[in-house]
Structure formats: structure tokens, C-alpha cells
A protein has these predicted regions:
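Detector for outer-membrane/organellar transmembrane beta-barrel domains
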Residues: 110-178, 186
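Outer-membrane beta-barrel initiation region
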Residues: 24-59
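Cleavable N-terminal export/targeting peptides
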Residues: 1-29
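Hydrophobic/aromatic-rich structural module bridging two neighboring secondary-structure elements via a short loop
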Residues: 75-116
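Outer-membrane beta-barrel "beta-signal"
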Residues: 158, 193, 199, 219-230
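Transmembrane beta-strand segments that form the barrel wall of outer-membrane beta-barrel proteins
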Residues: 32-40, 61-73, 90-104, 127-138, ...
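Short loop/turn motifs that connect adjacent beta-strands in outer-membrane beta-barrel proteins
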Residues: 23-29, 89, 160-168, 196-209
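Residues that define the transmembrane beta-barrel architecture of outer-membrane proteins
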Residues: 28, 48-52, 59, 75-79, ...
């Protein structure tokens, strides 16, 4: 939910091909990659079918800037820009979600659009990670009375290894009534289980393959998606 993408990708590419060091001596790290998924699943909803989801990012000394996109078979596509800072297990960040569809304008943050800015706070304890997200600008959602809801979502996730496969289990909920997540009050809207395994393609090359089973207890929906990462 892209204008700055060309400039951003150029910066990332330049960083990959020429060693850059920040003034404090810490190298700037860059990464670029993509996922290909059978369904685009997000927070208890299926947003799209098969999709190509590229990402590019820079990180220096805990400060990161990244762009992520999703483009499927429909006319709509999504671009998310994230600025975040992490230290220890603590992370704070802001994400701009931009849904590009017919008639949409990037600088339009009115409540009637799908354009939205979200702030997040999180802490990774190792065995368990906690994250809180709140819509703060644009499509913030409405309460049943018509007031701004500042729709929020919090999630508890836990990684583990079983049978030689990396797993992650997560449960997410929205804490109060809002039409953004379609909740009339506190509601658990996402319960997911994701498995990831490296598949060897030769002696020195492998790709991660992952599968996600996601349920939405509130809407009584169940989704399944598989994907590969490059």
C-alpha cells in the first residue's frame, strides 16, 4: 500500500556494488529480495491471490529504511515504506501503506482512501515477541458512533524448531471497536502457523520455501498459502 521506489532502489543498488561506510565506521547494510506467494495473507485476511512481493532496504546501526511491495493478478498493487529503529530486542517504527488503484493519489491521506500511516512498538524476548500497531493517519477506521477509531492490532508470536523445520506461531487481536478490522469490540482476528524450510537446489544453492495456515476466529475464515523467497 511507490514514487520514491526508483530513487530508493538506486541507492540500495549503489550500496550493494560499492562499499559504503557511515561516518561512525559502521557499514551500511543493504538487502534486496522477493517472495512469490500463492495468496497474500495479512492479519487474518486474504488480500489478494498469487502475488510477487519484492523488498529492498538499508540498515545502519539499528536504523532501517525499507520498501516492500505486492503485485498480483488484479489491477491493484501495494507499496509499503517503513522507517524503524531497533536496539536490543526493542523496535519502534512507522509504516506508510499505499494501495495503488484506479484514481488513487499517493499524497491523499483522507479517511476515505486506503492510504494509511501506522506506528508500531515491539519487543523480542527471544522465545516470544510482542508487537503493537496503531493506524495514526489516513484510514484510521471509525467507531460505531462515527468517531476516529485509530484502529490497532497487537500480536504475540513464538518461533520454534520441530522436525528439522523452522516454525512460527502467532495470535493477533484488535483491542477495541473499529470498522478497519471489522470488530465490534475486542476481537481475536488472526491465528497463524508458518513453516519454513531451505530446499537445496544443487551443492551450493538453496531457496527458502514456506507455508502459512491462517485463521480468523472473528470472521470464521481459514486460509492457506505457500511461497518461495529469493
Amino acid at each position: 500500500m511507490k514514487k520514491r521506489m526508483v530513487i530508493f532502489a538506486a541507492i540500495a543498488a549503489a550500496t550493494v556494488f560499492s562499499p559504503i561506510s557511515a561516518h561512525a565506521g559502521e557499514p551500511i547494510k543493504a538487502e534486496i529480495g522477493t517472495d512469490i506467494v500463492s495468496s497474500y495473507l495479512w492479519r487474518g485476511s486474504r488480500l489478494d491471490g498469487p502475488a510477487f512481493q519484492p523488498t529492498v532496504g538499508l540498515e545502519w546501526n539499528g536504523l532501517s529504511l525499507s520498501a516492500w511491495g505486492s503485485s498480483g493478478l488484479s489491477d491493484a498493487c501495494e507499496v509499503d515504506l517503513t522507517l524503524a529503529y531497533s536496539i536490543g530486542g526493542f523496535t519502534v517504527g512507522v509504516t506508510d501503506y499505499w494501495a495503488a488503484y484506479t484514481g488513487a493519489k499517493f499524497f491523499d491521506f483522507s479517511a476515505e482512501t486506503l492510504h494509511m500511516a501506522e506506528v508500531n512498538l515491539g519487543y523480542d524476548f527471544g522465545p516470544v515477541a510482542l508487537n503493537w500497531y496503531t493506524n495514526c493517519l489516513g484510514a484510521v477506521g471509525c467507531t460505531p458512533e462515527g468517531a476516529k477509531a485509530y484502529a490497532s492490532y497487537f500480536e504475540v508470536s513464538a518461533p520454534f524448531c520441530l522436525g528439522g523445520i523452522d516454525w512460527s506461531a502467532a495470535v493477533g487481536a484488535t483491542p477495541w471497536a473499529n470498522d478497519y478490522y471489522g470488530a465490534e469490540g475486542f476481537a481475536v482476528i488472526c491465528a497463524s502457523l508458518t513453516a519454513t524450510k531451505e530446499i537445496a537446489l544443487g551443492s551450493d544453492f538453496s531457496i527458502p520455501v514456506f507455508a502459512s495456515l491462517m485463521a480468523n476466529p472473528r470472521s470464521e475464515q481459514l486460509f492457506f498459502s505457500v511461497g518461495v523467497s529469493f
